[in-house]
Amino acid sequence: MRRILCLAVVIFIINDVSSQGLGSNKNWKKSGMSLSSPGNKKPTGNNNAVPQKSKMNNVNQNSLSQPKRPSHPGNSMYFMGNQGPMGMMGGFGMGMNNKQMREFMIAKRTHGVSPFLKKKICHMAKVAPPVNGIMPSPPQLYAQGFKIRRIGKWFSHDLDWSEGVAMCHNKEMEHRGCEKTPSAKWGRMFPGMGGMGGMGGMGGMMMGSRPMASCDVTKPNSCGNPALMKCSKYHKDRFGMPVCCATSEMTANQLENMGF
């Protein structure tokens, strides 16, 4: 009888020590349970010690199998926090919502017109553009009187994405922007194609890597109807080619209603 009592005491001590050792595990602490609680102690024999240990292992594995949840990339603060104050000032200055802010940052990172950027971003300059071609920072642009236009499906093409901004030159301020389709005739033949992203519709796929409407400044009708669009020598795509621009805000609205 004494031997059985001594054996039970030894088993109790061993279980208590092992419980305290596992209780110090960080993952066990995160689970919010305590091994030293009276409900988890059953010092009545060897048969109770084994299932108690397996139960503890199961709980421990469950706590380990739950990875930390990363910050969601769709959060606007994620993008703004990684873009720095310059990107934040540019986005807030444009009055963008969260979705437009993300699209703007995508376009900034790709250094070109992004297929996800469904709205044209254009700074209408009230001052002459810089002679050296270097784009000022957004705060300097706002201080110089630049206005920002977001125009439907349209894109601006004479871009310098190093500052994450797009600018239309002052010399053709009457041009609201440059149309996106690869050619004006493709817009007439396939109405609605101008609103497609990526290659700019069927015409863009035919022209390969040139998704904008390049034109010839020496040919007045190279953009189609000269009353609606004309070839601008001041607005160029990222290949340095002149592109077609609307002659006024009124004609820009007409082109947009026509499906450009």
Curated annotation (Swiss-Prot):
Expressed in mantle distal zone, mantle margin and grafted pearl pockets. Not expressed in adductor muscle, gills, hemocytes or ungrafted pearl pockets. Within the mantle, specifically expressed in mineralizing outer epithelium cells (at protein level). After secretion incorporated into acid-insoluble nacre matrix of shell and pearl (at protein level). Not found in acid-insoluble matrix of shell prisms (at protein level). GO terms for cellular component: extracellular region. Residues 33-68 have a biased composition (Polar residues). Residues 23-75 are annotated as: Disordered. The keyword Aminoacyl-tRNA synthetase does not apply. Keywords: Secreted, Signal. The keyword RNA-binding does not apply. Disulfide bonds: none annotated. Transmembrane segments: none annotated. Residues 1-19 form the signal peptide. It is found in: Secreted. This is Methionine-rich nacre protein.
